[in-house]
């Protein structure tokens, strides 16, 4: 009787151990699953916000040919300024990057190229002060308003990108989620630096 009683107690103990192990394994699995899915969702949010930044950059690029042609019609001898804008636009067009290509070096290079374009556009818009007919041209006024709006949206979208990138980075770098991130190739994303106008819309003076 003692033998069977002790064996019964042993079976109960084994079942309890198995239950505890199963609970621990399931807890680890669900935590692991939650951490991984969270990283995927946050990485997708970063990618989506980067697309918003690129869309605003592209919108600005699309405005430039019409703007240059309009200014050229009234200030054709401002060749140097017009050429600067055209060249800066060409450089910016070549620097369109996928989110997976971004690191600190490439983002800094992109910011510099976009900053050069903003500066060239500011100089182009400033010459309207010397040409009253240009300044009064409705197409020019429309382009001016669109450009100002686009510059503001660029600044807003960059700030939003920094926010989601910081949240994503903080999430994947915290222990023990950093172990999951390392296993599945989740890497941190760079930020736009708050210098040289990177965080503020370039001011277009008239």
Where are these regions (language model features)?
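A helix-centric hydrophobic-segment signal that preferentially recognizes long
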Residues: 1, 11-206
């Amino acid at each position: 009787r003692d033998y069977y009683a002790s064996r019964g107690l042993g079976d109960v103990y084994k079942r309890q151990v198995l239950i505890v192990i199963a609970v621990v394994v399931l807890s680890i699995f669900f935590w692991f699953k939650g951490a991984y899915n969270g990283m995927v969702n946050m990485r997708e949010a970063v990618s989506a916000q980067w697309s918003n930044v690129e869309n605003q950059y592209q919108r600005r690029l699309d405005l430039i040919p019409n703007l240059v042609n309009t200014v050229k019609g009234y200030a054709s001898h401002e060749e140097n300024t017009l050429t600067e804008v055209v060249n800066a636009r060409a450089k910016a067009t070549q620097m369109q990057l996928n989110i997976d290509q971004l690191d600190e070096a490439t983002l800094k290079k992109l910011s510099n190229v976009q900053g050069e374009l903003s500066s060239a556009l500011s100089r182009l818009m400033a010459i309207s002060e010397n040409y009253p007919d240009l300044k009064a041209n409705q197409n020019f006024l429309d382009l001016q308003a669109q450009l100002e709006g686009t510059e503001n949206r660029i600044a807003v979208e960059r700030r939003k990108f920094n926010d989601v990138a910081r949240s994503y980075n903080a999430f994947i770098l915290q222990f023990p989620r950093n172990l999951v991130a390392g296993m599945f190739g989740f890497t941190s994303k760079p930020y736009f630096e708050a210098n040289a106008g990177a965080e503020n819309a370039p001011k277009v003076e008239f």
